[in-house]
């Protein structure tokens, strides 16, 4: 029996870069969840990320003693491990980077429901225009995630919170081969 496919989701938040940690890490719990998700994937995994997300992936890999740039990008062959980088709205509160947009919490709630339950149709059908207005991080990553997931695949949720008014998730899926 061949091994299954591991898929993980982490946010592409710059606060995860070492330069932002400082003496007191503002995202210690999030960082720990992200590091564990990358460790769970193993040494070699494909990455679905925008340029900012790639910086975060490189930093997470280095924190584990791995070559920051050795992660494979793209999904040309069927990989056995994939890291997707993306996050929810950056407009969930008055102090959020994009300030408050009343639609943000509902949007993120529907996105989280789709992620938790492996609703690939909902992930494919995300409103990209609304996502842009709500400052969703790397919405294309969620569409790529839909290509990887098996419909109904439940996620293991390691982190789901909105510090600084931005929705972040760390989730993992173990899929059959």
Label each residue range with its predicted role:
Residues 73-110:
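Active-site beta-strand/loop microenvironment that shapes enzyme catalytic pockets
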Residues 25-32, 55, 106, 136-140, ...:
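Conserved active-site and cofactor/substrate-binding residues in soluble primary-metabolism enzymes
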Residues 1-58, 64-68:
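A short aromatic-anchored loop/beta-hairpin motif
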Residues 165-177:
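Short, basic/aromatic-enriched C-terminal tail that caps enzymatic domains
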Residues 52-61, 92-100:
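Short Gly/Thr/Asp-enriched flexible loops that form oxyanion-binding sites at enzyme active sites
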Residues 1-6, 76, 174-177:
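Short, low-complexity, intrinsically disordered N-terminal peptides in bacterial proteins
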Residues 115-156, 160-163:
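Polyanion-binding loop/helix "lid" in catalytic or ligand-binding cores
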């Amino acid at each position: 029996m061949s091994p299954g496919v591991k898929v993980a989701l982490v946010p592409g938040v710059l606060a995860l870069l070492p330069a932002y940690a400082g003496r007191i890490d503002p995202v210690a719990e999030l960082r720990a969840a992200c590091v564990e998700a990358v460790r769970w994937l193993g040494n070699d995994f494909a990455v679905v990320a925008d340029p900012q997300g790639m910086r975060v992936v490189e930093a997470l890999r280095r924190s584990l003693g791995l070559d920051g740039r050795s992660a494979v990008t793209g999904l040309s062959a069927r990989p056995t491990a994939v890291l997707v980088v993306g996050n929810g709205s950056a407009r969930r509160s008055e102090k959020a980077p994009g300030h408050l947009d009343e639609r943000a919490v509902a949007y993120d709630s529907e996105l989280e429901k789709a992620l938790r339950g492996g609703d690939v149709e909902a992930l494919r059908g995300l409103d990209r225009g609304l996502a842009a207005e709500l400052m969703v991080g790397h919405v294309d990553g969620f569409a790529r995630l839909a290509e990887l997931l098996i419909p109904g695949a439940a996620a293991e949720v390691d982190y789901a919170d909105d510090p600084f008014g931005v929705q972040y998730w760390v989730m993992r899926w173990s899929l059959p081969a």
